[in-house]
Amino acid sequence: MKRISSVLFAVAGLCMASAISLADEAKIAQAVTPLPEDLRAEAGVYDYDDNGERLTYREAGNHVECQPRDENGFTTCTSTATAARRDLSAKLSAEGLSGGELQAALASAEEAGEVDPMPMGSMFYRAYDKDDRIQLLWVVFLPDAVSDVLGMSTLSQRDNSLAGKGLPWMMREGTGSAHLMIPINGTEISNLGGASMSLDTKAIEDPIKHATLPLPEDLRPYAAVIDYDDEGNRKVLRPGRNAIECRVRDEQTGFTRCYHRSLGAETDMQAKLMAEGKTMQEVFAAVGEARESGELTPPPLGSLAYRLYEEDDRLKLLWVMRLPNAMAADLGMPTGSQRDASLEGKGLPWMMREGTSSAHLMIPINGTELSNSK
């Protein structure tokens, strides 16, 4: 009888362990939903108890970790580089701190060297399970950044995002919590909707109106518009009143581009070299050398560039955040290409050329009248 009881106890223990394991597996699967596929399998999963102590469900095998859906319906993921900061925040919250008091305590911890500041350009991922908020949102933290310096819009896209066609926009500029909101349209967990039809951009004959199409509405009226003659000389079609400069469509490439005005000298150099008959490879090499020598000043870290293309064989509406010399692991960013998904109208942002002076975050814009169709 004693032996039978021992066997039954052991079996019950195995069943309980199996049940806990299955529960943890379900929690892990749910927690990684905000991430792109290439980060999910090795992302860490954790939570906090009522005392603010960390509970680990799966150790991180890459540079991202996720917290399961909370009582407010949010599932979040972020860089493992910010773990110490989040752990401290959880303990302070458990002690009753919130709002300004909590932020002040974190700032004091930064000054004391107890936690690192939020890295410039670090990524945060959020999923929400109802349609009254943005359901899939990625955020790039840009502490103390100002929209005009980075060439960003501050016009809220919340309503457009709920309709499946929101554009990125900056919030809380000039503060320690400044960030770029990137609503993700077009995926299976995004808000439903999107533009009902595409805009016939080729029918737009006004060169200034066409040149500013890649921009959000609030930046278009104030952007400079330029072109180049056959000898590579700059022609100003409209002076600018913000940080953005747009170039009319390049008939050879089909691209219409807008960028931070600090890149003007670089585009001037490229135009001159192209007019001299240099190949693209030679132009890129010359520009690279000029950057290294300091002849060309790089654009601010985090600044945006905007590109429109009007055929279906490439990303039609693409925004690019410049992150010179940044590494994906430091910022919690993915590097898996989303080109094919973007052509289908459901691409996610991804980093390219990490660790180089031309490192950048590709931000395909889905769901708008200028975007690739599903």
Which residues are covered by each model-predicted region?
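Primary mode marks residue(s) on the alpha4-beta5-alpha5 output face of response regulator receiver
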Residues: 24-374
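Sec/Tat signal peptide C-region and signal peptidase I cleavage site
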Residues: 18-23
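Bacterial N-terminal signal peptides that target proteins for export
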Residues: 1-9
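Bacterial N-terminal signal peptides
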Residues: 9-17
